[in-house]
């Protein structure tokens, strides 16, 4: 039980201290890809929604 809490604490601390990693900027050579990189985290949600649309199309068999 204690190991679980310490693991959660380590994960939270590393997330807080590395937040600059998540909000970093692309190098100038790749600046034109900024719009694509901004959309990329949302792409898995599209697949999740597609599953519901697909099931609705086949009447939730």
UniProtKB/Swiss-Prot annotation:
Subcellular location: Plastid, Chloroplast thylakoid membrane
Ranges that cross the membrane: 36-56
Primary subcellular site in the record, as a coarse category: plastid
Keywords: Chloroplast, Membrane, Photosynthesis, Photosystem II, Plastid, Reaction center, Thylakoid, Transmembrane, Transmembrane helix
Gene Ontology biological process: photosynthesis
Cellular component terms per the entry's GO annotation: chloroplast thylakoid membrane; photosystem II reaction center
Chloroplast as UniProt keyword: yes
Record carries keyword Membrane: yes
Propeptide residue intervals: 1-24
Protein topology in the membrane: Single-pass membrane protein
Domain of life: Eukaryota
Recorded family membership: Belongs to the PsbK family.
Quaternary structure (record): PSII is composed of 1 copy each of membrane proteins PsbA, PsbB, PsbC, PsbD, PsbE, PsbF, PsbH, PsbI, PsbJ, PsbK, PsbL, PsbM, PsbT, PsbX, PsbY, PsbZ, Psb30/Ycf12, at least 3 peripheral proteins of the oxygen-evolving complex and a large number of cofactors. It forms dimeric complexes.
Function: One of the components of the core complex of photosystem II (PSII). PSII is a light-driven water:plastoquinone oxidoreductase that uses light energy to abstract electrons from H(2)O, generating O(2) and a proton gradient subsequently used for ATP formation. It consists of a core antenna complex that captures photons, and an electron transfer chain that converts photonic excitation into a charge separation.
Name of the protein in its database record: Photosystem II reaction center protein K
Organism of this sequence: Solanum lycopersicum
């Amino acid at each position: 039980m204690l190991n679980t809490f310490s693991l959660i604490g380590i994960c939270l601390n590393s997330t807080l201290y590395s937040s600059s990693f998540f909000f970093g900027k692309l190098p100038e050579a790749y600046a034109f890809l900024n719009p694509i990189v901004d959309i990329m985290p949302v792409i898995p949600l599209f697949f999740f929604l597609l599953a519901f649309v697909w099931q609705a199309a086949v009447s939730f068999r």
